[in-house]
């Protein structure tokens, strides 16, 4: 590796990196105070008022595990007793149905609703394992539609009237028109990234676009973390990533080979009888997302003491 990962945020907002000449373009981001220091403490006021939380899950860069995160967070929240709908907004390239094992049940899509060919309840696919979890695909595979921001807003407004507690939008990769339309109806966002400098750069760009679209309640999910590489200074720690982006941390998901098995079987990791380390991390992140206090997992002794803070893992 050509760079060191020992970085500190200086008082003037710049990033100091020891033993390196690597110049980072990132500046710590300042979000609304209520979304940073109170991420785990404040009650879910939206649900108390009867307003569903509309959250877009995005990344900028493809291949970082955004759709996997959407499926597992949505399933975990549903298992906690909330009504959840997952919206696959990746037009023509949907994958969320595969990760949930619902690909054979997609008959109608959101485009059929908007074109007047079916009702909303006909396009919604209810998961048979947890009936308070539903899926709505924007379009069928191989179809390419120009979904405008107005039509996307109309669609989400219709879902908000169905009694759901959480609406999670799986955003397309990239920052083109599809991204803008997908984030338009959202009030909150989860940025999924990996501890790689290219992924972090894209996440920083996405964070700026979210701000420009009026989304200030943003949380960070760091995926594919490898503790052995962090200990050898071959990978940035979660704290490095979080401080570079300046976004409140929702969770950190370790690298897990079971993700491939989970995807092929259409069964989210959080449904395994014996949860893997990444499954535990997804469940903990979901609990923090809904406002329940929880701890970051211990990657060294995960099953002996799951709920202790692993400060070395976070880089403290």
From Swiss-Prot:
SUPFAM superfamilies: P-loop containing nucleoside triphosphate hydrolases (SSF52540). It comes from the Eukaryota. Gene3D superfamilies: P-loop containing nucleotide triphosphate hydrolases. Keywords: ATP-binding, Cell cycle, Cell division, Chloroplast, Nucleotide-binding, Plastid, Septation. The keyword Cell cycle applies. One of its GO terms (cellular component) is cytoplasmic side of plasma membrane. Belongs to the ParA family. MinD subfamily. This is Putative septum site-determining protein MinD. It comes from Oltmannsiellopsis viridis. It is found in: Plastid, Chloroplast. Pfam families: ParA (PF10609). CDD domains: MinD. ATP binds at residues 61-68. One of its GO terms (biological process) is negative regulation of cell division. NCBIfam families: minD_bact (TIGR01968). Its main location: plastid. ATPase required for the correct placement of the division site. One of its GO terms (molecular function) is ATP hydrolysis activity.
């Amino acid at each position: 590796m050509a760079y060191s990962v020992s970085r500190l945020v200086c008082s003037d907002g710049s990033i100091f990196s020891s033993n390196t000449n690597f110049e980072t373009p990132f500046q710590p981001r300042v979000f609304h105070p209520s979304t940073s220091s109170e991420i785990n403490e404040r009650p879910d006021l939206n649900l108390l008022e009867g307003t569903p939380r509309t959250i877009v899950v995005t990344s900028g860069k493809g291949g970082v595990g955004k759709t996997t995160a959407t499926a597992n967070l949505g399933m975990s929240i549903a298992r906690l007793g909330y009504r959840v709908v997952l919206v696959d907004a990746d037009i023509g390239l949907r994958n969320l149905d595969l990760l949930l094992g619902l690909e054979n049940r997609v008959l109608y899509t959101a485009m059929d609703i908007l074109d007047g060919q079916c009702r909303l309840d006909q396009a919604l696919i209810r998961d048979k394992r947890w009936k308070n979890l539903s899926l709505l695909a924007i379009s069928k595979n191989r179809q390419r539609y120009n979904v405008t921001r107005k039509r996307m807003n109309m669609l989400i407004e219709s879902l908000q009237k169905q009694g759901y507690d959480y609406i999670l939008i799986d955003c397309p990769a990239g920052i083109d028109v599809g991204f803008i339309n997908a984030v338009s109806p959202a009030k909150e966002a989860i940025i999924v990234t990996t501890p790689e400098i290219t992924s972090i750069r894209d996440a920083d760009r996405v964070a700026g676009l979210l701000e420009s679209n009026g989304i200030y309640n943003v949380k960070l999910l760091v995926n594919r973390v490898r503790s052995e590489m962090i200990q050898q200074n071959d990978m940035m720690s979660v704290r490095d990533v979080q401080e570079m982006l300046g976004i409140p941390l929702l969770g950190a998901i370790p690298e897990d080979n079971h993700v491939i098995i989970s995807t092929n079987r259409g069964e989210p990791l959080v449904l395994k009888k014996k949860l893997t380390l990444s499954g535990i991390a997804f469940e903990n992140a979901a609990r923090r997302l809904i406002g329940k206090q929880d701890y970051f997992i211990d990657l060294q002794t995960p099953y002996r003491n799951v709920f202790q803070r692993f400060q070395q893992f976070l880089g403290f």
